[in-house]
């Protein structure tokens, strides 16, 4: 049913990507039970975002295991080289591991959401401002981070103009195959 709903969401509702929250299922991203969904994402030519890193506490009554180490994307990226994988939440506390996966695999990207930009790990700021500027996408995980606050903090950062444009807009346009708006 899930694969049918994914196809329907893309073909009939205009969805441009998929989202997976591995912690809810207690299954790491490289669990083979996800592979039919990955194959469908490839067929539909859409990226899939998934939380990597530790699980945040959204509810004290339901604590979930942290099953999304960024290294688990390694096997998926190898098995599905055409699948565009976006590891969201920066991979914290394994940010270096997340950067390593994005650097190693052409099809792995990083979403810098769920953490206020002023609290981004220094290595992710360096990566997105230099050799990884084509691999990082901005996000807020609203309502976790207020978009206005996040933009103000990004504007306060010492980012190169080209890197900032890619972070905030260009990388998402390319990855999600979105049209450029007129006058942009």
Task: List each model region and its residues.
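Active-site-adjacent C-terminal substructures of enzyme catalytic domains
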Residues: 78, 84, 91-148, 156-162
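Active-site gating/metal-coordination segments in enzymes
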Residues: 1-56, 61-62, 182
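Conserved, mostly hydrophobic/aromatic
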Residues: 9, 18, 41, 89, ...
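Mid-to-C-terminal alpha-helical segments outside catalytic/metal-binding sites
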Residues: 8, 132-137, 145-184
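Histidine/lysine/aspartate-rich catalytic loop segments that bind and position anionic ligands
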Residues: 42-44, 53-58, 62-64, 70-72, ...
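Alpha-helical scaffolding within the catalytic cores
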Residues: 2-6, 70-73, 94-97, 120-123
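Short beta->alpha connector loops
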Residues: 1, 23-24, 67, 90-94, ...
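Acidic (Asp/Glu)-rich catalytic clusters
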Residues: 5-14, 36-44, 75-80, 99-105, ...
């Amino acid at each position: 049913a899930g694969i049918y709903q994914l196809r329907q969401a893309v073909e009939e509702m205009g969805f441009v990507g998929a989202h997976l929250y591995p912690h809810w299922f207690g299954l790491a991203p490289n669990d083979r039970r996800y592979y039919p969904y990955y194959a469908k994402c490839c067929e539909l030519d859409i990226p899939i975002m998934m939380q990597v890193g530790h699980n945040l506490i959204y509810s004290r009554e339901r604590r979930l295991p942290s099953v999304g180490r960024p290294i688990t994307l390694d096997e998926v990226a190898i098995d599905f080289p055409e699948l565009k994988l976006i590891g969201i939440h920066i991979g914290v506390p394994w940010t270096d591991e997340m950067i390593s996966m994005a650097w190693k695999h052409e099809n792995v990207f990083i979403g810098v959401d769920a953490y206020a930009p002023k609290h981004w790990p220094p290595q992710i700021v360096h990566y997105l401002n230099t050799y990884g500027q084509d691999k990082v996408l901005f996000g807020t995980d609203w309502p976790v981070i207020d978009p206005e606050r996040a933009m103000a903090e990004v504007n306060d950062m010492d980012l190169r103009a080209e890197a900032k444009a890619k972070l905030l807009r260009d990388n998402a346009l390319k990855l999600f195959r979105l049209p450029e708006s007129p006058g942009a």
